[in-house]
Swiss-Prot record:
Any one GO biological process: fatty acid biosynthetic process
One Pfam family matching this protein: ACP_syn_III
Family: Belongs to the thiolase-like superfamily. FabH family.
One Gene Ontology CC term in the entry: cytoplasm
Protein name (record): Beta-ketoacyl-[acyl-carrier-protein] synthase III
Stretch list, region ACP-binding: 262-266
Residues forming the catalytic site: 119, 261, 291
Pathway the protein takes part in: Lipid metabolism; fatty acid biosynthesis
Domain comment (free text): The last Arg residue of the ACP-binding site is essential for the weak association between ACP/AcpP and FabH.
InterPro entries, sorted: ACP_syn_III_C, ACP_syn_III_N, FabH, Thiolase-like
Lineage: Bacteria, Bacillati, Cyanobacteriota, Cyanophyceae, Synechococcales
Record EC number: 2.3.1.180
Length: 335
């Protein structure tokens, strides 16, 4: 859809949705595959189980179902959506899975594209969407985080296979000329530390014609230096949120909720402690779903909204962090 040049000064958050596969993989079941135990996994990660996609499920299908939930909560007509951004690192079409979601929704007036920033992806995508809306280019946006990391896990590596699950979440955002509910944001990247967490390409030489080498593309499994990623998260995430507090004249007492990327319960607890955020304000569903990458924040958000935990006008400090290395934070007022 063409830009509509509205006089919008802010955004409002109109709806949320989520979807997780039916298949549940427990710690006990993983312990039959690798040398580990339920107690070992829970004590180090806080995870008890995770959802795994079935053969007929993929990023587009999960993202579509999450988006539908957000659109229904917002009570929008599908044709009024201008923008769809899919945050994913595991598209079922490497050229982009957002157009497939657009097609499934029937959102014929929306431009749709993928954004890749790993576990920071949803936050980065949501911030990107708000800037289009605040510029007056579009009126209504759906932002989706959907990932299927189970397809890229080395199921013989107990350090990483215990962490990840599949799922999707989405939010509906609308441009407004009233109060801006995006109170502030910050985004950062440090590519020099990218090797701490990555999913590298893997090329295989297949054919030689006239001394020209041809290779088929592919990817290996997730590579992670858990200790370095932990140190990165507990150092950088409190810092970026605290700096955002200072810029917006907020503090830990003025927020209602702390919503972090659901990577590891130890990280959530440590960040909360460093920010002096009380435990009851820290949102966590990590035990049930594990790390669903770009889906963790909207999945937790939707769960808290539908359980009537998060209410209209609640102030939420949120942060995504992960591969890149990338990290960011946003302060929002829900509604």
């Amino acid at each position: 859809m063409e830009g509509i040049n509205l006089n919008q000064i802010g955004v409002s958050f109109k709806g949320s949705g989520s979807y997780v596969p039916n298949q549940i993989l427990t710690n006990q079941e993983i312990s039959k595959k690798v040398e580990t135990s339920d107690e070992w996994i829970k004590s180090r990660t806080g995870i008890s189980q995770r959802r795994i996609s079935g053969l007929s499920e993929n990023v587009s299908e999960m993202g579509y179902k999450a988006a539908l939930g957000a659109i229904e909560m917002a009570r929008w007509d599908i044709e009024t959506i201008d923008l769809i951004i899919l945050a994913t690192s595991t598209p079922n079409d490497l050229f982009g899975s957002a157009p497939e979601i657009q097609s499934k929704l029937g959102a014929i007036n929306a431009v749709a594209f993928d954004l890749t920033a790993a576990c920071s992806g949803f936050l980065f995508a949501a911030i990107t969407a708000t800037q289009f809306l605040k510029a007056g280019s579009y009126k209504r946006a759906v932002v989706i985080g959907s990932d299927q990391l189970s397809s890229y896990v080395d199921w013989n590596d107990r350090r990483s296979c215990i962490l990840f699950g599949d799922g999707a979440g989405a939010i509906a955002i609308e441009g407004t000329n009233e109060l801006d509910n995006l109170l502030g944001f910050s985004m950062r990247t440090d590519g020099q530390r990218g090797s701490f967490l990555n999913l590298p390409s893997q090329n295989n030489q297949d054919l030689i014609i006239n001394d020209i080498n041809f290779s088929s593309g592919g990817f290996s499994s997730i590579k992670m230096n858990g200790q370095e990623v932990y140190k990165f998260a507990v150092r950088e995430v409190p810092l970026i949120i605290d700096n955002l507090f200072k810029k917006t004249n907020f503090n830990s007492e003025k927020i209602n909720w702390l919503l972090l990327h659901q990577a590891n319960q130890r990280i959530l607890d440590s960040v909360g402690e460093r920010l002096n955020v009380s435990t009851e304000k820290i949102l966590s569903n990590l035990s049930n779903y594990g790390n669903t990458s770009a889906a963790t924040i909207p999945l937790m958000l939707d769960e808290a909204i539908r359980n009537k935990k998060i209410k209209e006008n609640d102030i939420i400090a949120t942060s995504g962090f992960g591969a890149g290395l990338s990290w960011g934070a946003a302060l929002i007022r829900w509604g």
